[in-house]
Amino acid sequence: GGGIDLSVGATYALCQVIAMKMAITGDPVLAILVGVIIGIGVGAANGVITTFFRINSLIATLATSFVITGGAALITGGNLITNFAVTGYAAFARTQFLDVTTAAWTMIGVVIVLAIVLSRTIAGRYMYAAGSNAEASRLAGVRVQWIKLVTFALSGGAAALGGILDSSRVLSASSANGGTALTFTVLAGIVVGGTSILGGEGAVWRTVVGVLFIAIIGNGFTLLGWNPLYEQITLGVILLLAVGGDAWSRLRTG
């Protein structure tokens, strides 16, 4: 859709905090559903702010990320939420089928669905078109504002699902689990995977490759016992090179 969502890390944290608290005191299935719906709502709110109020997505989502992070911190009181008795909630990510966890199956399912939507449907083509040239798409009859709103809503829902799966796996949640570090790790994976930072170009499978590449780097630093600060520096350099490469490619192609 051509926008940048810097609130994914904050949404990730907020939704896992809400889902975890609800799972401790109530129905874990309802907790998961509510968490995902809240994520979609946050994303939709970002979409409304950026499209209908014409605020730059970078600024808008940066601002909402602070609001969301503050809200998550108020809910937790700045403390870690943990409860190893919520077995129903734990089953969401830990149950295995064919020796593969449901968390992995969920990721595979989401990837397949998004790949089909983006490459095989009219809605997917509209998303690429809106990101590539919003004005031309609008003149061609594409409802660009609604396409961008839906794209932001999907981003929020995906962030929420990721946060809930993570808290289900470790049976804990914290407002500090998201934030800038996670957001820029996500951005690095996406850009390294070949998705243009300006929109209109990319593929789901390439994004998966980019994210796996970034994850391998992170695991490598951990296994080698290297200073985490060097990992941040490395990710920053990788992100800069990837964005620079994208800009250079666009200049060459006119």
What role is predicted for each listed range?
Residues 26-65, 109, 209-210:
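Alpha-helical transmembrane segments within multi-pass membrane transporters and channels
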Residues 113, 132, 139-146, 169, ...:
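Cytosolic-side transmembrane-helix boundaries in multi-pass membrane proteins
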Residues 53, 57-121, 147-150, 169-179:
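Transmembrane helix-bundle core of multi-pass membrane transporters
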Residues 65-72, 106-117, 152-163, 189-195, ...:
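Hydrophobic core segments of alpha-helical transmembrane domains in multi-pass membrane transport
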